[in-house]
Design a protein with these regions (language model features):
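Catalytic cores of carbohydrate-active enzymes across secretory and cytosolic contexts
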Residues: 1-473
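Short, basic/aromatic recognition patches
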Residues: 478-486
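Short, N-terminal intrinsically disordered low-complexity segments that are rich in Pro/Gly
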Residues: 5-9, 509-514
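Conserved protein kinase catalytic core
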Residues: 159, 394, 505-507, 512
Length: 527
């Protein structure tokens, strides 16, 4: 950055939000695509760097892609193809043979990086997200004794829709090379098993959620992703009252102004335009709120090279301009659009300073912003308005749920949120905070690790071996959006215990029992 030297910028995406605290606790190696302008300047001779810079706790291994590879693998097949295929948001997927070939090539390259990072021939490999559907098969071919856990962070489509992809069989066979395939919800698991039943020589046991195929056995489970708890960003932030004052001062608002917040990537799945229409209806139906209520939409620029994303950006800009022109005055704007990257500390300041948070996803695997809002409110105040089409709605029962396509319903829920008594706010927030605290990121990772350990110990799968056979384990976390890690679990256990709010959680049991996690590798796209 001009005049500032090298600056560390952390992604606000859900995958990084979930994985980064686990990496800090496990002291691992994260294999990731390097996209920052200074990434090559900071790596060592093995394309690695220790992070975070101030207090390094894990290693980041970079994989480099050129422009055509980035366009074909990431922008093309992964996002124009798979992202659109897996989300019901009105955008048709685009599939090109050249994009799939590049996707396969890049998956093979990340898999090779995993093989280079691991020690021994029986690692535990955790592969993350839709960017790496083929990687489990490539890793299996190179490390046949490995235990592979693939986690798919976004929704899995229904079988008929999946078959629109010309390479749907290759995707399924790639994932079925895993010992365990994880999803956000049980609905996703059902859709995946329905899809697998279309493959020859695959037998699905619905009672156990197990697929048997070509001598292999793959377990299919739901592991709802979550946040670290206690939340480091909350402990490092100002008190809630100070955050309220700070954000209103920054926005030039009077202290009594009611404030709503939305935090999204500029993505067509996030329902930002529908959200703005609901706010417009709210101001129509409640004239008394004009001048007394402001909604801040943090909109992270995303995939700007794709037409669908440019279109949604223009729709958001036009809606904001129209609503502000209709209800605004010389000193008042009902909508404040902040179209830029915000560091996590900035986001949490707004979450802690707002009266309500509106998550209006049209289709979302989980949506961690909803959980971040809950995590941020240690004052047990604030109201979460949450789309029923986000996976988080299945866990956060204290939220006011909406169908974002029903504008009138959404406006009514927003009015209810603004009028909710403090005691009801506290009751709802307390119940949601209990869920997020108990089922946190360490619980999420720990369950996957524990299930993998149990699979190996029991020898239940012909494509895994019992963990007890070796004292040195390797954890490969995530081929897709982030990278791999090397973890030593004797040290990792103590670190995890320090960061957890509960004592006997799955990651601790896994570490104490079946694992001594040594140098895990987590392949991902970019942290």
């Amino acid at each position: 950055m001009p005049g500032q030297g090298i600056v560390v910028s952390r992604s606000s995406g859900g995958l990084v939000t979930a994985l980064e605290p686990v990496m800090r606790a496990c002291f691992g190696t994260w294999v990731a695509h390097g996209t920052g302008t200074a990434d090559k300047a900071v790596v060592d001779c093995r394309d690695g760097v220790r992070v975070p810079p101030a207090t390094p706790t894990y290693r980041l291994r970079r994989v480099w892609l050129n422009g055509p590879e980035e366009r074909g693998y990431y922008s093309g097949f992964a996002n124009e193809g798979l992202w659109a295929l897996c989300h019901d948001a009105g955008v048709k997927p685009v599939f090109r043979p050249n994009d799939f070939e590049t996707y396969a090539t890049v998956n093979a390259r990340f898999s090779e990086a995993v093989v280079e990072e691991v020690e021994g021939d029986s690692p535990l490999v955790l592969v993350q997200d839709y960017h790496f559907a083929l990687a489990p098969l490539y890793v299996r071919k190179r490390l046949p004794q490995s235990t592979i856990v693939a986690f798919w962070h976004i929704p899995w489509p229904r079988r008929r829709k999946l078959m629109a992809c010309p390479w749907w069989r290759e995707l399924l066979y790639g994932l079925l090379a895993s010992s365990i395939v994880g999803f956000q919800t049980t609905d996703d698991c059902v859709n995946f098993l329905d899809s697998v039943e279309a493959l020859p020589r695959c037998r699905v046991d619905r009672t156990q959620n197990v697929v048997t195929h070509d001598g292999y056995r793959t377990v299919v489970r739901a592991y709802p992703v979550s946040l670290e708890w206690p939340n480091r960003l909350v402990s490092e932030s100002l008190p809630v009252g100070a955050c309220r004052e700070a954000v209103r001062r920054e926005l030039g608002l009077e202290p009594g102004i009611r404030l709503g917040i939305g935090v999204d990537r500029l993505d067509y799945t996030k329902g930002i335009v529908h959200k703005l229409l609901a706010i417009e209806r709210l101001l129509e139906d409640h004239p008394d709120l004009r001048g007394r209520c402001v909604f801040v939409q943090i909109a992270e620029p995303s995939r700007t090279g794709l037409a669908a994303y440019r279109d949604v950006r223009m729709s958001v800009l036009n809606a904001c301009a129209r609503i502000n022109a209709r209800f605004g005055t010389g000193t008042y704007r009902p909508i404040v659009l902040r179209e830029r990257h915000h560091e996590p500390a900035e986001v949490y300041r707004f979450l802690r300073g707002a009266d309500l948070c509106y998550v209006g996803s049209l289709h979302d695997g989980m949506n961690l912003v909803a959980k971040e809002f809950v995590s941020s409110r240690d004052d047990e105040r604030g109201v979460l308005v949450l789309s029923r089409f986000a996976g988080a709605a299945q866990e956060l029962r204290g939220a006011l749920t909406v169908n974002p396509y029903k504008i009138e319903e959404s406006a009514s829920r927003l009015a209810e949120a603004l009028q909710m008594p403090e005691q009801e706010q506290a009751d709802r927030m307390r119940s949601m905070r209990t869920v997020v605290a108990e089922f946190n990121a360490f619980w999420w990772a720990g369950r996957m690790i524990e299930d993998a350990a149990n699979s190996r110990q029991a020898g239940r799968s012909t494509n895994t071996i019992p963990f007890a056979g070796s004292s040195r384990r390797r954890l490969n976390f995530r081929v897709g959006e982030s990278a791999g890690h090397d973890v030593t679990c004797t040290a990792g256990t103590a670190a995890v215990a320090r960061e957890r709010s509960r004592l006997h959680d799955p990651i601790d049991r896994a570490a104490r029992g079946a694992f001594r996690l040594r140098s895990p590798v987590w392949p991902c796209r970019t942290p």
